[in-house]
């Protein structure tokens, strides 16, 4: 079982490492559902020796991005790769809340060029047809997708997550997130068949 802890600063990353987290997701401004952290925090977190996935999101609000904003994210992904991060964490939707395939493809390609994995974050939960959207992420080449199954918590969305894990057939990692705690993670693993889990405290 891989446990990914969501962290908003270097001190939290250090605590996660010392608490035996498998990996961290580094972001800033959780009150806005997470934005790109500072370059200084990215570099300092990577230096702690734990795999660091970095949120790449230039602003709060809707997950529909302009060409200028996509360009900013491409540059941020490149920096993360050069800094030694493990993956970028991104989510781009179109006006109908489907996957923005064109933008996501460009971002995945840039991540791969700089040795980064690619997590599509919980913007996925807004997609009305999750099975179709999962297929698109697989075709694009995303490493993983973070999801609560479209429910307020992963436990409430466990049946949807289980279906997505089944459909994924090992082609993409389906990672439950949303209310995941030490007290429910084993049950959630049993219900969904997932092997990676995301939360603010998982130990």
Label the model's feature ranges.
Residues 6-8, 27-29, 55-57:
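Acidic/polar N-terminal loop/beta-strand segments that form early-domain functional surfaces
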């Amino acid at each position: 079982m891989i446990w990914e802890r969501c962290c908003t600063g270097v001190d939290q990353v250090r605590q996660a490492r010392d608490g035996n987290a498998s990996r961290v997701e580094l972001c800033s401004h959780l009150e806005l559902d997470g934005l790109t952290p500072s370059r200084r925090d990215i570099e300092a977190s990577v230096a702690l020796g734990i795999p660091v996935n970095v949120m790449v999101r230039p602003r709060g609000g809707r997950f529909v991005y302009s060409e200028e904003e996509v360009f900013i994210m491409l540059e941020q992904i490149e920096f993360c790769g050069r800094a030694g991060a493990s993956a970028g964490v991104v989510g781009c939707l179109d006006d109908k809340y489907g996957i923005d395939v064109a933008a996501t493809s460009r971002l995945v390609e840039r991540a791969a060029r700089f040795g980064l994995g690619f997590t599509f974050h919980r913007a996925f939960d807004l997609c009305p047809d999750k099975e179709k959207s999962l297929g698109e992420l697989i075709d694009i080449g995303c490493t993983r997708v973070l999801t609560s199954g479209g429910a307020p918590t992963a436990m409430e969305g466990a049946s949807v997550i289980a279906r997505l894990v089944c459909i994924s057939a090992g082609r993409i990692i389906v990672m439950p997130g949303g209310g995941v705690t030490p007290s429910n993670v084993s049950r959630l693993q049993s219900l969904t068949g997932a092997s990676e889990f995301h939360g603010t405290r998982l130990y």
